[in-house]
Amino acid sequence: MKRRDILKGLTIFPLSAGIFGKTFLNPALTGPSLNTKSKRDLFKELGIRTFINARGTITFMTGSLMHDYVLETISDTSKEFCMLDELQDKVGEKIAQMSHAESAMVTSGAFSALTLGMAGILTGTDRKYAEQLPNLEGSGMKSEVIIQKSHKIDYNHALLNCGVKLVFVETPGDVDAAVNERTASMHFLGSGAVEGTIMPEDWLRLAKKHNLPASIDIAANIPPVSNIWHFNDMGFHFVALSGGKAIRGPQSAGILMGTKEIIAGARLNAPPRGFNVGRGMKVNKEEILGMYVALERYLQQDHDVEWKMWESRVKTIASAAESVKGVSTRSYVPPIADHTPTINIEWDTEKIKISGDQMLKKLSAGSPSIEAYGGGKNSITVSPWMMLPGQEKIVAERIKQELSKASA
C-alpha cells in the first residue's frame, strides 16, 4: 500500500480489507520477513547480542517484533508531511470505532496513555489548569486517586506524574470512606484483577455511586482480542493499552481510549502543545499510522489459528524436554496478563544436576542465544508467544541438549 493510499483512507474510507484482510497469510504464521533485514548488520557491527525470545513481550527485551505491514507503513508515510493534530483526529476516530470508544488517540506507550488520561480528567480542556500540572496545591483541581492496595505497582508513577496522591483501599467500604471532595478518579489495574478484592464490575459500580470517572490499565491484557473493546463496553472512562506486545505495532506507541471529554483533555496535555505535562511524550506521524494499521490488522487476524499455533509450539518443546528421563512438563495459560499457552519444565535434581538458574544462563550464553525465564531450584518457564516460525524447534533441541548433558 502506498503512503498516499493510507492517508487517503483516513479521510474517505477504512484501509481496504482486500489489502489488509484475510486474503493475506496470517502474520502469526509467517512472522516478519527475513528479507526486511538491511545489508548492514548493525547488531553485529556494534557487538549487540540478539536472541530467540522464549519469554514474552518484555520491554527491556525490546517487546515484540513489528509485522512487515507496520514497517512498510512507517517507511511509506515517512515521505510526506501532514498536520499532527489532523492526523490524531482522523486516526483517533478510526481507533475509537474499532474499540467501541467515544474517542481515542495514539500515545507514546501505555505509560504515556495513563499520564495523559489522568491529566485529561484533572484539567479537562482548560489551558490554565494544564499549565499548572503537576502542581495541584491551590490550583482548584482535584488531587486524589483511589486504587486497590493489591494494584500497587511501579507503573502507577504514570498517574503520579500529574501530581496526584494515590489512596489505597481493600474493600468497598474502604472506597466509600476514602471518597472526599479531593477525589479525582478511581483507577484499576487490569492485570491485577485476580489479586484484587474488588472486581472490575464492582469497581465501576462504586465509581458510578460516587459520580467518579474510572480508569483501567490493560497494557498487558491482550490477548484476548475482545479486551480491546470489552472495557470500553463496560463503561470505563479511559482505557490505556500498549501498542507493542500482542498487537505488534511500534513498541514505543500506545493507545488511549475513553470519553470524548477525557480524550479532549488528554490531547490538550499532549504534543504538539508545549505548555503541558505531556510535551516530552512525542509520537511521530509514522508511529501513529503504524499503530493504526497494526490495530486494524490485528482485529482481522484469525486468532483461533494463532492460538493453535502456540499450542503446537508448546507440544514440540514439551516432547523434546520429556524425552530426557527425570523431566516433567506442565502446560498452562496465565489467567490475565500474557494470556497465551506457556510451558513450565521441571526436573528431578537427583537425576539431572543443574539448577533452573544455571539452565537459563546456559541457554542465554549459547548460540543462538535463548532467553527463557523462571529459574530457581529445578525448573524454567518458556513462552513460545514471540518466537518466529521454526524457532520452537531450536528451543526444544537446546533444552533437550542441556538437560541431557546434566543427566547423572
Where are these regions (language model features)?
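Conserved C-terminal alpha-helix-loop-beta "cap" of PLP-dependent enzymes
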Residues: L42, A320-R398
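N-terminal export signals
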Residues: D5-A28
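Flexible, glycine/charged-enriched surface loops at secondary-structure junctions
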Residues: L84-D89, S103-A104, G278-M281, Q301-W310, ...
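A glycine-/small-polar-enriched, mobile loop at the entrance of the PLP active site in fold-type I
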Residues: I52-K90
